[in-house]
Amino acid sequence: MAKHEQAVPQSKQQAGSATSSGVSGATRYEHVGEEYLERRRLRKSAGWILLWALGVGAVISGDFFGWNYGLAAGGFGGLLIATLVVAVMYVCMVYSIAELSAALPHAGGFYSFTRNAFGPTLGFVNGVADIIEYVVTPAVVVISIAAYMQTLFPEVPLYVWWILYYVIFVGINALGTELTLRVGLVVTLMAMAVLIIFYIGAVASGAFSWALVFNIPPEPGGSMFLPFGWYGIFAALPFGIWFYLAIEQLPLAAEESHNAVTDMPKALIWGIVTLLALSLFTLVLNSGVGGGAAEVGESAAPLEIGFQSIFGEGATKIALTVAALTGLVASFHTIIYAYGRVLFSLSRAGYIPRWISVTSATQHTPHRALIVGGLVGLGLAFLIDQLGSASTVGAALLTMSVFGAVISYALVMISYIKLAISRPNMPRPYKSPLGVPGAVVGTILALVSLAATMAIETNRPGVIGTAVFLIVMIVYFFVYSRHKLVAQAPEEESALLEAAEAELRRH
């Protein structure tokens, strides 16, 4: 540690806060001086509208691509039912984390909630699952961005676009949280405008047809609504997740919210309402244009099919490319914000190297965490390119982001249930109207979605990749970082204080 971050001698601290036990076994905490946290300070910059845009922007690329492969897996009916099931899971989760983010407004988000419920080990596991989701996803998205850019500038190598987009958007994130969130608002509104233009155009032009929605030939035992039978619903679940994946990143902005107690629940709830509406319009209208569900379900650019069916094949390549890029850029930009905060919070608490969490002196943004995540993302982009985007590794990385997300969903809702039982008197400025029953339903649906992700054979490499990374990080935790945790990190401090008070009550 640098001299201004020296640990405070244990004798000057309460003895009861030096160690922690539970599902994790013994952990050891170091007590740091005030300068440590001062060098890791975030700036409050967000009201609920900017938070809403952060959440919706992170997800909105899922309305542009990815979801449509569920048509090939389950047909329109299978994907529709799967999307509704997944929507119930997300609503249950959003209400649960709205309550937790108001009660525990820390930058750690899911890691903080699970750490307070089950201790450092499972808290760290949830944090690592978030790292997988938020670091891998931008790498996959930037490859799609570069592919679109190459249609306009074929002479420019793909890697130039990867580097350029990472430099631009990591740079924006590093220049200030308020700038980051305002840019996020602009690109999110642009992406929503593109979708709304498509919705109106599909209906007004007559391009949409219900016959096209149900044009996938049914297999034996299937129907026009469920061409692949009831199993098609199960197989389509991972693709329904694309419509909502990453709304859960919002609690990571708690320490940068002007009033997390009121703004965070409001932004989360309005965010999921917005995404529910967009998902249904996209699913129905985009499935019924062009060559219908049969063509859209196999396309890498389903929205492009939609716009061509409205405006004709002569629609300019530039217009279609810009339209597609808005959604991709919105998610790329906002998920960079997310990985920066996950790495920052885990580093500040000592789970990963502490130097990563130092913030910039003037803007108080986690610039080191942003750069580290960006370098890893770029490395993954080069890896995917070298081995082929359709290769086992490329597909595995896509699956890892979804698999990591679903693991974190199950853990956070189980944490909600545990905290409701073990800490009933914890101040909860906002309470989920669904309460524990909602969290139970959400947990069950998350586990079903986890099973669906594992059941698809092509997803197995991603499942293995996630498991390997989790095991490596857990070994790192037990061998090294569990002895280096920081007692004054907000996520740890609240849990340690509760543990100390519980110990006093027992005596």
What spans do the regions from the language model cover?
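Membrane-interface "cap" regions at the ends of multi-pass membrane proteins
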Residues: 1-78, 90-91, 95, 107, ...
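Helix-loop-helix junctions that connect adjacent transmembrane segments
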Residues: 37, 79-80, 154-157, 186-321
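C-terminal membrane-solvent junction of multi-pass transporters and transport-like membrane proteins
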Residues: 41, 183, 356-364, 406-458
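Extracellular loop-to-transmembrane helix junctions
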Residues: 64-161, 271-277, 281, 408, ...
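A generic transmembrane alpha-helix motif of multi-pass inner-membrane proteins
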Residues: 85, 395, 399-400, 404-405, ...
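Membrane-helix boundary/coupling elements in multi-pass transport proteins
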Residues: 106, 129-143, 244, 248-257, ...
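TM-loop-TM module centered on a large, flexible mid-protein loop between adjacent transmembrane helices
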Residues: 112-113, 119, 151, 155, ...
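Membrane-interface loop-to-helix entry segments
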Residues: 146, 158-217, 245, 268-273, ...
